[in-house]
Amino acid sequence: MDFYSSLLPFLILIYLEFCSGFNRVCYYNGWALYRDSEHALKPENIDAFLCTHLVFAFGAIDETGTRIYVPEVFEDMHLFERMNELRHRNEDLNLVLSVGGWDMGSEAWSEVLASKDNMQTFVKEAIVYLRLHDFDGIDLDWEYPTFRGSKPIDREKFTQLIEIFRHEMDIEETPDDKWDLCLSVAVDPSEYMSSSSYEIDKITKNIDFYNLKMYDFHGHWNDPVLVKHHSALTSSSSLPSVNELAKMWVQRGVPKRKINIGIPFFGRSYRTAQPNATIGDPALGPGSDGGIGIPVSNICHLIRGGTKEHYLKEENVPFIVNGDEWVGFDNPRSVREKAALVRNNRLGGIMVWAIDMDDHSGWCGEKFPLMMSIIHGLGEYVDYMSDTLEAEREMINKKIRKAAREISYYSDKGNSTMAKKMEDKLNQLKDHLSAVQAHQSVQWANVQYSAGLGGKPLPSKDTPSWSW
């Protein structure tokens, strides 16, 4: 082997470490379709280039512990098919099914783990289900092994389930690597919960990545109930933060590429005993949302309406006070800074819960402002715009090619009237393409200019969000 050949494996590792893109894992809550018209998000209205992985939440497990299913209401709305349509715009988009969630609890998972036969059957049936509905992978979101009725032995058994998944996925015959299914696990990243629920070293070997829920560090469920931000970026105390937990997971020996940092697109609220409460003050319970979380698309309305936004210096995250309600959340600035943490430390990427909670309608400004902030923070804005503009041109080119085929067809059939009609349509499409290309050239110049400045600059922290 010559010197240059011996360098090849090393160079490949360098490329994978520093040149490959980041994961942008976006959970999509199926129930988002049933919100009021302004906040409802249909699958077809999702920008197909915002995410590398679009994760449907949630699939459930039947009473036998051997099969996955989704509520009939989702099947009736053909949500899977509508999500698949996004691939016509972006063929590289990965569609993933997340199974579990908080509402499902532990009982169904324990049924899966009841025997080795159950686990084998569940995994094989799951793979069939994924292939039937054209999913690219599965995300296991058990909340949480060894808790909520789950036995201590389930920690070890969950590892066994994951090992069976890995084995069955590896032996599945596929045309090429692009068809391989991916396997991820959504976890509570705190030291106590993750150590109690998971055999991290064994699981890590068998999954593609972790989706770390870097939120809900605090909330109305704590005793005593104190006002605290639920997703602090940094902290000078012993309180959990995104920065410290990310370090902990790397120190555990988890490869950086397998760590996706979770960002909440919702706020956590408290009803306070006194107005203008601050961090550490006692709270009476959850705020007006009843503890379910307030979508950022709602919070931006309040800020645009004049509610003053504040910033926590130690935690580097924002909050608002609305009467006796205190709400901690993430805004475009804090989201971008969390994404920059991922970029600077070469972690695997970002996970968001959930894309349907972003301002997808553009009521407060640009559409999907938090996702766009993530793209800027990861340094992927140029690639995103390149893909988006190319897809826009390709849609028109497809219509041009179709019109050309129809001209040929009608000419061969001797139908000059229809051939002329198609020629007119073809000319209109070509004119439209020229106009789009002219507009895109201006857009691209602005993109390049912004990239030369290091990305869209952040204003001062005193500048209200959704005003820049």
From Swiss-Prot:
Active site residues of this protein: 143 (proton donor)
Q: Write down the InterPro entries for this protein, in alphabetical order.
A: Chitinase_II/V-like_cat, Chitinase_insertion_sf, Glyco_hydro18_cat, Glyco_hydro_18_chit_AS, Glycoside_hydrolase_SF, Glycosyl_Hydrlase_18
Q: In which tissues is it expressed?
A: Prismatic layer of shell (at protein level). Expressed primarily in the mantle with highest level in the outer epithelium of the mantle edge and lower level in the mantle pallium.
Parts forming coiled coils: 386-440
Q: Which reaction does it catalyse?
A: Random endo-hydrolysis of N-acetyl-beta-D-glucosaminide (1->4)-beta-linkages in chitin and chitodextrins
Is Manganese among the key words of this record?
Answer: no
Q: Which Pfam families match?
A: Glyco_hydro_18
Where along this sequence does the record place binding of chitin? 73-74, 100-103, 144, 213-216, 353
Q: Which UniProt keywords apply?
A: Coiled coil, Disulfide bond, Glycosidase, Hydrolase, Secreted, Signal
Question: Domain GH18: where?
Answer: 22-381
Name the record gives this protein: Putative chitinase 1
What organism does this protein naturally occur in?
Answer: Margaritifera margaritifera (Freshwater pearl mussel)
